[in-house]
Each structure stands twice: as C-alpha cells, then as structure tokens.
C-alpha cells in the first residue's frame, strides 16, 4: 500500500492564521478610526455651535443698528410659531420681553443646538441652566450679553467670550 500525501486541491476556506491576521487588521483600523471619527463629530458640533453664536450676535447687532438708523421704527422679529412680533425702538436691554423676542426669533427660524438637536439653540432669560451649545441672551442696564457654552477638543466645557453691545453708544 502506497502512502498518498494530502493535497490542498479540494480544501475551501481560510486557515486560522489568515483569519487571525484579518481580525488583527480590523482591530487596528478600529483603534485608530473610532477616536478620529469621534474627534470629527466633536469638531463639527463645536463649529456649528460657534456659527450659531456668531449668527445671533450679528443679527442682534444689525437690528439694534437698524433701530437707530431708522429713527425708532419698531423691529419686526419672527416668533416661535413663524409669525411676526414687533419690538419697539429704542431697544431696552433690561426688558425681558425684548430678550425673549430675540430668543423666540431664533427658535422660530429653527436654530437647533448641535449638541442636543431636539432642542432649540436658545434658552430663556429666566436664569435656567444652559447646556453646551445653548445660547443665552440677557440684558443689564444698557448692555446686551450673549453667552454660549461649548465643549472643547478634550470634551471640557468652555464659555464663549461674552459679546456685549452698549446701547448708549448706538442709541444716542
């Protein structure tokens, strides 16, 4: 009887070594890719939050300047339901109704918090806590203060520098 050497002709599939190499490659790709993906997501949320902040600041600044230039013509702002509300000129930063009208305007436009997309990007001036990505507007004496908290690249909360508009400089 002759001994016949086994052949690999009819074997189908992968060897254990080949499978282990593929699993190791997938593990390395996941170890590198997942943190990078999370970093990209965090960067995009931070960028969107800062764009919202700048949009709010520019809008309020423009509306106050238009108020002065147009000789007291009331501002027409959008309300939460998409309708129009008017705010008298000159603007009173201490008036919660004025602050609320600005907040409602951005909620009516559908501005969302990038960290919590189900919620508006603005919070109420009643002093409620503001989560990251949330923009608050508050008025004191002759100053509008617009604030925002965001997460930095390390995931730590940071405050966007306050933007202040001194009303006495614009209204006369």
Task: Say what each PLM segment does.
Residues 5, 18, 51-54, 63, ...:
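Glutamate identity and glutamate-enriched acidic tracts
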Residues 42-71:
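Membrane-proximal N-terminal amphipathic helix
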Residues 65-172:
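Periplasmic/extracellular, small/polar-rich flexible segments of pilin-like filament-forming proteins
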Residues 5, 13-17, 26, 56, ...:
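Generic N-terminal initiation segments characterized by hydrophobic and/or small/turn-forming residues
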Residues 9-38:
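N-terminal single-pass transmembrane signal-anchor helix
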């Amino acid at each position: 009887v002759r001994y016949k050497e086994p052949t690999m002709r009819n074997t189908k599939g992968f060897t254990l070594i080949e499978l282990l190499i593929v699993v190791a490659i997938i593990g390395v790709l996941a170890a590198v890719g997942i943190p990078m993906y999370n970093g990209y997501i965090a960067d995009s949320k931070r960028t969107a939050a800062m764009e919202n902040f700048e949009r709010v600041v520019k809008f309020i600044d423009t509306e106050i300047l238009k108020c002065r230039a147009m000789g007291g013509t009331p501002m027409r702002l959008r309300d939460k339901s998409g309708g129009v509300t008017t705010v008298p000129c000159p603007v009173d930063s201490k008036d919660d109704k004025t602050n609320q009208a600005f907040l409602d305007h951005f909620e009516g436009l559908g501005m969302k918090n990038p960290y919590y997309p189900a919620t508006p990007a603005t919070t109420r001036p009643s002093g409620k806590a503001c989560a990251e990505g949330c923009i608050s507007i508050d008025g004191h004496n002759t100053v509008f203060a617009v604030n925002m908290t965001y997460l930095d690249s390390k995931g730590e909360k940071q405050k966007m520098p306050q933007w202040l508009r001194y009303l006495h400089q614009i209204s006369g």
